[in-house]
Regions:
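Conserved beta-strand elements of the Class I
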Residues: 110-113, 217
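Reductase modules of NAD(P)H-dependent flavoproteins
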Residues: 2-3, 141, 148-258
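Conserved S-adenosyl-L-methionine
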Residues: 107, 132-138
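Short, Lys/Arg- and Gly-enriched loop/turn segments at beta-strand edges
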Residues: 46-53, 96-104
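Ferredoxin-reductase
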Residues: 2-87
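Ser/Thr-glycine-rich phosphate-binding loops at phosphate-binding pockets of nucleotides
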Residues: 115-121
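Histidine-anchored nucleotide/phosphate-binding helix
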Residues: 121-133
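Short helix-loop-beta connector
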Residues: 104-109, 211-212
């Protein structure tokens, strides 16, 4: 297990009965790009049980943070949901992923399209100063079923704009657009529906997405990913064909169902 180290849980926050965040220590030698994921897990019956988790903390943070659903009979999540401070976790030492800014062509606006725990990699990206150096506006769209699933909403709306170093950039350039499908909320509807109907752009005061000036990153369920890619493709966007090659939008290829 030379590619895996042991980290200690620092804190756990349960957003509701299906969603939680946990923070761990971070080995000083671990380096990653914002948007990357690592393998994470526990020893179960003497063997490592590992799954891929996007890092929700920024690469300049001294800790690691992860966002997870709770699956009652899930081999790993059924155990992770009972984590408490002081517990040990296995964390991979080789962060990887295709959801990175470097694979996007230059543009004016960056759209971060997420559903559910697909928000996680974008939490690191919106805390990266480089994101705001590259784009005039950064639009974070988070689609969920229930209001209680809007993880990090208070942090995004209240804490991040007051951040000592990032605050001014965030206030000037970040637009947060949470949308809910199964409860009353100020924005309602599926992520792809608010884009296709044009409601998103009316609400945020930007023109409809245009491949000449706009770029996108997508992370969410397999169905959401397929629908979002189709939506962008139909509008003339071109996906980054592989890691290291530029495109109008990127997805996390490792999470795509084969």
């Amino acid at each position: 297990m030379s590619n895996t180290g042991i980290e200690r849980v620092l804190s756990v926050h349960h957003w509701n009965d299906t969603l939680f965040t946990f923070r761990t220590t971070r080995d000083a030698s671990l380096r990653f790009r914002n948007g990357h994921f690592v393998m994470l897990g526990l020893h179960v019956e003497g063997k490592p049980l590992m799954r891929a988790y996007s890092v929700a903390s920024a690469n300049h943070d001294e800790h690691l943070e992860f966002l997870s659903i709770k699956v009652p009979d899930g081999p790993l999540t059924s155990r992770l949901q009972h984590l408490k401070p002081g517990d040990e976790l296995l964390v991979g030492r080789k962060p990887v992923g295709s959801l990175v800014l470097d694979d996007l062509r230059p543009g004016r606006h960056l759209y971060l399209l997420s559903t559910g725990t697909g928000l996680a990699p974008f939490m690191s990206i919106i805390q990266d100063p480089d994101t705001y150096e590259r784009f005039e506006k950064v639009v974070l769209i988070h689609g969920v079923r229930l209001v209680s699933e809007l993880a990090y909403a208070d942090f995004i709306e209240r804490e991040l704009p007051e951040h000592e170093f990032l605050g001014e950039l965030v206030r000037d350039r970040l637009i947060y657009y949470p949308t809910v499908t199964r409860e009353p909320f100020r924005h309602q509807g599926r992520l792809t529906d608010v884009i296709e109907s044009g409601r998103l752009f009316t609400d945020i005061g930007l023109p409809p997405i245009d491949p000449a000036v706009d770029r996108a990153m997508i992370c969410g369920s397999a169905a959401m990913l397929a629908d979002s890619c189709r939506l962008l493709d139909e509008r003339g966007f071109h996906i980054s064909p592989r890691q290291g090659e530029l495109g109008d939008y990127v997805i996390e290829r490792a999470f795509v169902e084969k």
